[in-house]
Amino acid sequence: MYSAYATPVNQDQTASSVTVLTEKDFAERNATYVSDVLKTVPGVAMGANGGRGALTSLFLRGAESNHTVVIIDGVKMNPVNGGGFDFGGLSLSNIDRIEVLRGEQSALWGSDAMGGVIYITTKSGLYKDKPVNLDFDIGTGSHGTVDGSATVSGYNQGFYYSLHGDSHHTRGISALSDREFLYKGRNGAQYRPSFLGTERDKFHRDNASARVGFDDGKKGVEFLTSHSSQTMRYDSYFDAKDGMNDYKTRIRDTLYKFSGYLGSDQDLFKHKINLNRFKTDNKDYYGRYTARRDDASYQLDFNFDREGDIKQSLSLLTDYNKSRYLGSEYNHKLKLNEKSVALEYRLLSEEDHSLSISGRTINNSQYGHAFNARLAGAYRLSPNFRLHAALGSASQAPNVAEYFGYSGYSIANFELKSEKSRGGEFGLLTQTSDKRHNLDVTYFARNVKDLISDQIVSCITPTWCTYQAQNMSGTSHIRGVEIAYSGQLNDKLNAYANYTYTAAKDSSGLQLIRRPKHVANGGLAYKITEHWGSDVNISYVGKRVDDNKHRYQMPSYTLVNLGVNYQLSKNLNIYANLNNVFDRKYESTVRYGQDGRNVYVGLKGSF
């Protein structure tokens, strides 16, 4: 477990609510993109502005989409302009593991972690069984979808490397829905589209990465670089006759990272450094922006109690962040610098008891000072029962668009304050003695002050308005319950199921948009024979509200996906997925279409 503490720990010792997903879970849940598998996790709700590749936002435990930090290989990947991470184009082809850490995490991960952390680890080549390994995955499906990826990696006497490339293309569906949905809104308002989507909105993404390093367990260094390029078409609310119904966004992301460590968890001291640069070049109909974030961090682990069943340690973390942003909507370059220092104390027991206390102070050149803390603990009552609880605070600085405005559609507000959250959770994990069955029930709650929301300043037409980001008065309240089960029913049958209830209301008592009260997921994976396997997955998303102005009521929907796979040989596996089996027509965001019934077939190999 890499996300819950400053150092890796066993999942059984973690006090926070966290879900771990591996390649086995990706396959059993019919997932080809990160968004496919994340939506099956407790506490997660997602909204997409169209089909594959379209802007896709994640809402974790009722938090805003930009309140969840996304970490890939130890690097914060949230947009430099401060918006929420877009999961629409992120493929699983090079991903080894995903951790979804829920709750206030700013004490460890800084700003952007008010709702939690999505921690993603890609394939590194470290500890591979031979010097040269080849992994590939090719697939094709409905809507002219074609995917391909290949990874060459290896490990020998401490040295390791990984070279990866992938490409994804789909002719797609219309981003604007091609079907008419009628929604009722505030004060009897009704929404019925004046026109429907007609053309397909294509999506294409290419990605390449290279990694080389050395690790002997006592010391290690690594260099990682990656580059991705994606182009996606999307639609606007305007009629086709205005010539504005076919938009395109092109995004180029480049990452350079150098990291190293000296010492082990059994040594008194362990040192870690991390230097990285993340660059973005984004061009769309409205304009273009380039951004760069440079980050330098140092961590010192002090393992002062290393003997016996109980181990104690301290970690000191320092971080310096420098961001630069230049957009066509501004006449000058925006510069932000941030310095932070964090301290974490950990007590871990061989009997799965744990206690952690952490705090972080942040000083931002534009938004000032913030301090956040977290207390988390777990106690195993017996081999079958374990209590876990956490309390924490978090903060979220305004993003660039909120603070400085954007392209005349949003007015600057230099009086904005950072959003602040205080919350906690309490849960009970029940396990069988052999840990083949696990049931976790967790209650969570948070209060958010100074929540930032776009407010209408003026309107030229009913659909063309000028906005300004403002801090809402009062306190927003979020309460909920997560129930999650995972189990091995027998040697051939695995199952998972989860249900999340979320009551997310603003200071006026109105439900926050795009947060369904009820979400449920479940699935079975069955090993039919030595070569044949199958799976079925069901997802339910309850009623929710969209559009702050009109507050349209959106109905619930249920999706069923089926999968089958066949082991051709020791090294080759063919699989086929039938998604949205009953061809359910629905929208996750008002006005934007989603895939109906669709098929995907692929071949995986490992040599």
Specify the residue positions occupied by each region the protein language model found.
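Short, acidic, small-residue-rich periplasmic hinge/interaction motif at the N-terminus
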Residues: 1-27, 65
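Extracytoplasmic beta-strand/coil segments of soluble accessory domains associated
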Residues: 35, 39-75
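Short acidic/polar hinge/loop motifs at secondary-structure boundaries
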Residues: 75-104, 413
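A beta-strand signature from Gram-negative outer-membrane beta-barrel systems
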Residues: 90-135
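Periplasmic-side early beta-strands and strand-to-turn transitions of outer-membrane beta-barrels
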Residues: 119, 127-129, 135-139, 146, ...
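Face-selective signature of the C-terminal outer-membrane beta-barrel domain
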Residues: 213-230, 247-370, 374-380, 438-443, ...
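Outer-membrane beta-barrel signature, preferentially recognizing the C-terminal barrel domain
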Residues: 240, 245-259, 263, 365-367, ...
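Gram-negative outer-membrane beta-barrel transporters
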Residues: 352, 445-447, 470-547, 573, ...
